[in-house]
From Swiss-Prot:
A cellular component term, taken from the record's GO annotations: cytoplasm
Region feature (Disordered): 23-46, 96-130
Lineage, highest ranks first: Eukaryota, Fungi, Dikarya, Ascomycota, Saccharomycotina
Bias (Low complexity): 103-114
Protein source organism: Saccharomyces cerevisiae (strain ATCC 204508 / S288c) (Baker's yeast)
Protein name per Swiss-Prot or TrEMBL: OTU domain-containing protein 2
UniProt cross-references to Pfam families, sorted A to Z: OTU (PF02338)
PROSITE patterns: OTU
Length: 307
C-alpha cells in the first residue's frame, strides 16, 4: 500500500501547508544567495534558473494539495457534517416525529430504535463520503483526459523552429548519455576533426566537464541547488556521480563543455527562446535540441544538423 493510500502515513492539510511555507521560505533564501553570488555575465542564466525553480515548486505544491484532497478520507467530514441541507432538515424533522410517536414505547425499545437510527445515519454519512470521493476521482480523470497532448504540441513547435532555422533533428539514443552523445556528434560535425582527440567519447566528455567544474567551483554554485531536498548539492559527490555513471547531464555540463571547447552551445526548445551558453566562445557553435515531453524516459537531447 502506498503512502497516499495509507491513512496512517498521510500528512494532514495543516502539516502540508506548514511544509509548503517552509519550502517557499527556503527557496527564497537560496534564490537570494544565488543572485548575490552571480557574476554579471551569469546574471541572466541565474535569473532564468530562479524562475524555473519557483515554477517547479509551485506546481509540485499544487499537485500535493490536489492529491491529498482526492485521497484523504477525512476531506469531506468536517465541511459536510456542519452543512445544513434540505436532506438534513427533513432527516431532523423525521427524527423529532419518531421521538414523539415513541413516547409511550418501553424505554428499552426506544433505546434500541435510537441506536439503530444512529447506526443508519452513520452508514449514510459514510456512503455519502464515499460517493463524494468517487465523484472527485471521476472529475480528476475527466480533467486529465482534457489536458492537451504535450508531446504532440512540443514536437510540432520544435519542427517549426527547425524549419525556420534550416535545421534537422538527428536522433541520439535516449539514455543517460544523450547530452554527451549529442555534443560528441556536434564536435565531429562542426569542429576541426584534426583538433579532436581520436579517443573522444561520452565518458571522456563526462570527465572533461566534471574536471572543469572542480576547477571553477564558484561559477557553478548557482546551479547546484537541489529542488527535491531544497539544499545545495555537494560538488564532490555530484561530479563523482556524473563522471562515473549514466546520470543525465544538464545545464552544468553544457556550460562546462562550452568553456572546455571554447565555443557557444545553443539549446533549441519548445516555448522558450534559444538558450546560448558561452556566447563569446571562439570556435563554431554546437547546436542541440531539448525535449521535455517527447520521450518516455523523460528529458532528452538530440543533435541538430543543417538541413
Amino acid at each position: 500500500m502506498t503512502g497516499m493510500e495509507s491513512g496512517e502515513n498521510l500528512e494532514n492539510m495543516e502539516d502540508i501547508l506548514a511544509r509548503h511555507r517552509k519550502e517557499n521560505k527556503d527557496l527564497q533564501n537560496k534564490i537570494t544567495g544565488m543572485k548575490k553570488q552571480a557574476t554579471k555575465s551569469k546574471r541572466k542564466e541565474v535569473n532564468s534558473k530562479c524562475l524555473d525553480l519557483q515554477d517547479k515548486l509551485k506546481t509540485k505544491q499544487e499537485n500535493e494539495i490536489r492529491d491529498w484532497k482526492i485521497a484523504n478520507n477525512e476531506v469531506f467530514d468536517a465541511e459536510q457534517e456542519d452543512e445544513v441541507t434540505p436532506e438534513k432538515l427533513l432527516e431532523q424533522l423525521s427524527i423529532s416525529r419518531d421521538e414523539k410517536e415513541q413516547q409511550n414505547v418501553p424505554v428499552q425499545q426506544q433505546q434500541q430504535g435510537q441506536t439503530k437510527k444512529r447506526r443508519n445515519r452513520q452508514k449514510e454519512r459514510l456512503a455519502k463520503r464515499d460517493a463524494a470521493i468517487a465523484k472527485m476521482k471521476e472529475e480528476a480523470a475527466l480533467e486529465a483526459s482534457k489536458q492537451p497532448d504535450l508531446k504532440k504540441m512540443e514536437q510540432e513547435s520544435i519542427d517549426q523552429l527547425c524549419e525556420l532555422k534550416k535545421l534537422k533533428q538527428f536522433d541520439i539514443q535516449p539514455d543517460g548519455h544523450c547530452l554527451f552523445a549529442s555534443i560528441l556528434d556536434q564536435l565531429k560535425l562542426r569542429h576541426d576533426p584534426k583538433k579532436l582527440d581520436q579517443d573522444m567519447d561520452v565518458m571522456k566528455l563526462r570527465w572533461l566537464s566534471c574536471n572543469y567544474v572542480q576547477e571553477h567551483r564558484d561559477d557553478f554554485i548557482p546551479y547546484l541547488f537541489d529542488e527535491e531536498t531544497m539544499k545545495m548539492k555537494d560538488i564532490d559527490e555530484y561530479t563523482k556521480e556524473m563522471e562515473h555513471t549514466a546520470q543525465w547531464g544538464g545545464e552544468i555540463e553544457i556550460l562546462a563543455l562550452s568553456h572546455v571547447f571554447d565555443c557557444p552551445i545553443s539549446i533549441l526548445m519548445s516555448g522558450r527562446p534559444i538558450q546560448v551558453y558561452n556566447e563569446c566562445g571562439k570556435n563554431p557553435e554546437l547546436k542541440l535540441v531539448y525535449y521535455k515531453h517527447s520521450y518516455a524516459l523523460g528529458e532528452h537531447y538530440n543533435s541538430l544538423h543543417d538541413s
